[in-house]
Curated annotation (Swiss-Prot):
Keywords, ordered alphabetically: Amino-acid biosynthesis, ATP-binding, Cytoplasm, Kinase, Lysine biosynthesis, Nucleotide-binding, Transferase
Physiological role: Catalyzes the phosphorylation of LysW-gamma-alpha-aminoadipate. Does not phosphorylate N-acetyl-glutamate.
Catalytic reaction equation(s): [amino-group carrier protein]-C-terminal-N-(1,4-dicarboxybutan-1-yl)-L-glutamine + ATP = [amino-group carrier protein]-C-terminal-N-(1-carboxy-5-phosphooxy-5-oxopentan-1-yl)-L-glutamine + ADP
Pfam families for this protein: AA_kinase
Keyword Transferase set for record: yes
Classification via CDD domains: AAK_NAGK-UC
Gene of this entry: lysZ
Site (Transition state stabilizer): K5, K231
Residue sites binding substrate per the record: R64, N168
GO BP field: L-arginine biosynthetic process; lysine biosynthetic process via aminoadipic acid
UniProt name for this protein: [LysW]-aminoadipate kinase
Result after altering K123E: Does not bind LysW
Organism expressing this protein natively: Thermus thermophilus (strain ATCC BAA-163 / DSM 7039 / HB27)
Main location: cytoplasm
Matching InterPro entries: AceGlu_kinase-like_sf (IPR036393), AcgluKinase_fam (IPR004662), Asp/Glu/Uridylate_kinase (IPR001048), Glu/AcGlu_kinase (IPR001057), LysZ (IPR037529)
Amino acid sequence: MIVVKVGGAEGINYEAVAKDAASLWKEGVKLLLVHGGSAETNKVAEALGHPPRFLTHPGGQVSRLTDRKTLEIFEMVYCGLVNKRLVELLQKEGANAIGLSGLDGRLFVGRRKTAVKYVENGKVKVHRGDYTGTVEEVNKALLDLLLQAGYLPVLTPPALSYENEAINTDGDQIAALLATLYGAEALVYLSNVPGLLARYPDEASLVREIPVERIEDPEYLALAQGRMKRKVMGAVEAVRGGVKRVVFADARVENPIRRALSGEGTVVR
């Protein structure tokens, strides 16, 4: 099993990702694809007159402020535009893909956060009423059914809360959870940079390898900028869960998954 998280920033080559994933799937490789959609969500939110707002948390992670209107836009883009675009591309390449959100069949269930801490002007504040949360349960029986029937699952937030509300959840954490649950051979994070950079945004400063026992060292955690912090935290979670290899790699190139598995990017092992 290989779990691939496809980022949602500008510059992602979805056609190349789909072609590579379909090729692996046709060779008999079991795959789970998880995707984002942040850049498209920002565009749609702006077009609808409800521009995005982001919160920076005390640990440095950045998340989308998700009121009910934002949640609806999030669902439009993640469950609709991006998910079905990937499914269409995979079908064109001969892979029998099926797209699901965490709401479908209670695939991803978690706890809605009652309050979110964030930093503004150097002060820690609390935001309430956000539709965000953390996935704690996966409907593995549903995924197993699809995998055994020969489908390629394409998965996306939102998840379902214990109160049966849609909640914006972190796709990087979902990918790490799935990789741990399935004892994946590898967890691949594809984004619009070639991996972790020692001197962001200088792509020549790519960090080629991080020893698995050192992934939580401050010197490596400090390399993660912006939303990359969540991917690194996902890698930490996966490593703790027994996943032997995590790769941060480039989604702008041809054959991005194969190249990641061959050692391109930043490899944690």
